[in-house]
């Protein structure tokens, strides 16, 4: 049994009501519930945290190593384009991760095109809405099965 951690960055607590044309109508609670059910059905344990505070996400990443987390799914949200600290935390713990974005960041404002995570992630999924989380989970489980 593997343990997976899903991290949601700033403003994702507003999913379902925040710019539904961009981010969809699915709530964060619905995304988390779906991922928990899928992980459990596959015989794994899934944890999740949403925070608007960079330091809380960093602290959670640090704790993940001592807790034996095997894989991380992260939607850094706006921190994607700004946070060297989150990138460094992920590199420091050496836990593989997949970067997830609800919207296609490459079809949006130019400042959203750069990610501090993509080049060190196992993979990146963007533009598929809430389904992107499901696909990231499936990919993570495949990666874990192959290792």
Curated annotation (Swiss-Prot):
Substrate binds at residues 75, 81, 88, 102-103, 112. InterPro entries: DHquinase_II, DHquinase_II_CS, DHquinase_II_sf. GO terms for biological process: amino acid biosynthetic process; aromatic amino acid family biosynthetic process; chorismate biosynthetic process; quinate catabolic process. The record marks 18 as: Transition state stabilizer. The keyword Protein biosynthesis does not apply. Pathway: Metabolic intermediate biosynthesis; chorismate biosynthesis; chorismate from D-erythrose 4-phosphate and phosphoenolpyruvate: step 3/7. GO terms for molecular function: 3-dehydroquinate dehydratase activity. The active site is at residues 23, 101. Disulfide bonds: none annotated. It comes from the Bacteria. It catalyses: 3-dehydroquinate = 3-dehydroshikimate + H2O. Keywords: Amino-acid biosynthesis, Aromatic amino acid biosynthesis, Lyase. The keyword Phosphoprotein does not apply. Its EC number is 4.2.1.10. Homododecamer. Belongs to the type-II 3-dehydroquinase family. Catalyzes a trans-dehydration via an enolate intermediate. This is 3-dehydroquinate dehydratase.
